[in-house]
Swiss-Prot record:
This is Protein YmfN. It comes from Escherichia coli (strain K12). It comes from the Bacteria. One of its GO terms (molecular function) is endonuclease activity. Disulfide bonds: none annotated. Belongs to the phage terminase family. InterPro entries: TerL_ATPase (IPR046461), TerL_nuclease (IPR046462), Terminase_largesu-like (IPR005021), WH-like_DNA-bd_sf (IPR036388), WH_DNA-bd_sf (IPR036390).
Length: 455
């Protein structure tokens, strides 16, 4: 491979006073330059054309640059490439996805191109690598299917003790081969002895992203609650709760549909056929510098038929109202908890249809108990859902924010703006209202439990 001259601009210098080799080099550079005077020839090419050695050409170019005849111009990395295979190493170091995208778009002329990214964890959760990690997780858990993506993440599990030597093998599958166990053990011990080194060890040797906040709900447990056989027909005529999180008109809006049943004295929850809406422009008119990744998710879900696109730049709430009315025909709606943000008009419309809207402010008071109840129901197997991929994505994006000094009071937040939690928030509100309707003691229940007493 020839050594690249990384870019020089010929300033139209005069040849007077230069050595013959320098004049010849300038002439060759001029031949290679474009209209702006920019050229990208290899040193090997210049040397061959003027009949000089490569070391002579390098020395002459360095002298011409030092004397001001040439100025260095940065070249955009990867431009002009058409690779069969591109390998991006330590992707977490990339501030943007510019190089990755350049390589990917250059593969259009290849029949079986391969884009391969290799990396440890890093510190920039706003960067392209962390976003790619989320994309891989979404593919693996099935919320955003992608047959063109293969990904594998070696890291420790939630709740693992990072100081335990046993966890090293989880994050280092080649332990004892390309990295020695003794080395990892020594680094682990150093991190245990020096708090300043702990984050470095976790990031580089356990693939734990620094600054990344843990998801509140366990997605493995959530997926074990999945029951794709659940249909609305199974709950026809049974009261349900419709909960709405409307977000912004430019963003995704959601409706959760929740049923409850008493089984062996315990409340079981059923999330069936949730609905999601997003405006057309948010899905298909995203500029290159905007949130392309979210738009790609939305497009995939539209193709799957689980996301409804409304015309224009804003969600038309009339679509949502019609869906709520249709839901009421299948199952009588007992209540419609709704986020008050921007929802005044829809709330009035729901009231006109006797769908009993209840305004729920998303604060610690209203969200903590139902959020913890939903977690408990998921872990105990009392929660059942139909596997809607958008709801799964939203659940996986929920991070628990607690009151300082009190980890027992919590509310749902998202780690980043693109990590939508609308469906999860609607579901939590529905669980909160269902908790108020849990079976109460009637006179018959009391007599059955305690018998008749004489006063």
């Amino acid at each position: 491979m020839s050594t690249k001259l990384t870019g020089y601009v010929w300033d139209g210098c005069a040849a007077s006073g230069m050595k013959l080799s320098s004049v010849a080099i300038m002439a060759r550079l001029a031949d290679f330059s474009n209209d702006e005077g920019v050229c990208w020839p290899s040193i090997e090419t210049i040397a061959r054309q003027i009949g000089a050695g490569m070391s002579t050409v390098r020395t002459a170019i360095a002298r011409l640059e030092a004397e001001g005849w040439l100025t260095r111009k940065a070249r955009r990395q990867g431009d002009g490439s058409s690779p069969h295979c591109a390998v991006v190493d330590e992707y977490h170091e990339h501030a943007t996805d510019a190089l990755y995208t350049t390589m990917l778009t250059g593969m259009g002329a290849r029949r079986q191109p391969l884009m391969w990214a290799i990396t440890t964890a890093g510190y920039n959760i706003e960067g392209p690598c962390y976003d790619k990690r989320r994309e891989v997780i979404e593919m693996l858990n099935g919320s955003v299917p992608n047959d063109e993506l293969f990904g594998i993440i070696y890291t420790v599990d939630e709740g693992d003790d990072w100081t335990d030597p046993q966890v090293l093998e989880k994050a280092n599958p080649n332990i004892g081969v390309s990295v020695y166990r003794e080395f990892l053990l020594s680094q682990q011990q150093r991190a245990k002895n020096n708090a300043r080194l702990a984050n470095v060890f976790k990031t580089k040797h356990l693939n734990i992203w620094a600054s990344a906040r843990s998801a509140y709900f366990n997605l493995v447990s959530w997926q074990s609650c999945e029951d794709k056989s659940l249909t609305l027909e199974q709950f026809e005529g049974q009261p349900c709760i419709l909960a709405f999180d409307l977000a912004r008109k430019l963003d995704m809006n959601s409706m959760a549909r929740l049923y409850t049943r008493e089984i062996d004295g315990k409340t079981h929850y059923y999330s069936v056929a949730p609905r999601f809406w997003v405006p057309y422009d948010t899905v298909y008119s995203v500029e290159k510098n905007e949130d392309r990744r979210t738009a790609e998710r939305f497009q995939k879900w539209v193709e799957m038929g689980v996301l409804t696109v409304t015309d224009g730049a804003e969600v038309d709430y009339r679509y949502i109202l019609e869906e709520a009315k249709a839901a009421n025909k299948i199952s009588p709606v007992s209540e419609s908890p709704i986020d008050p943000f921007g929802a005044t008009g829809l709330s009035h419309d729901l009231a006109d249809e006797d769908l009993n809207p209840v305004t729920i402010i998303q604060n610690y008071t209203n969200m903590s108990d139902p959020m913890k109840e939903l977690e408990a129901a998921i872990e105990s197997g009392r929660f059942h859902h139909d596997g809607n991929p958008i709801m799964t994505w939203c659940i996986g994006n929920v991070v628990g924010k607690t009151i300082p000094g009190n980890d027992d009071v919590v509310k749902p937040v998202k780690e980043q703006a693109e990590n939508k939690i609308d469906g999860a928030v609607a579901l939590i509100m529905a669980v909160g209202r269902a908790m108020l309707y849990e079976k109460e003691d009637t006179l018959s229940d009391h007599i059955e439990s305690y018998g008749i007493r004489s006063l």
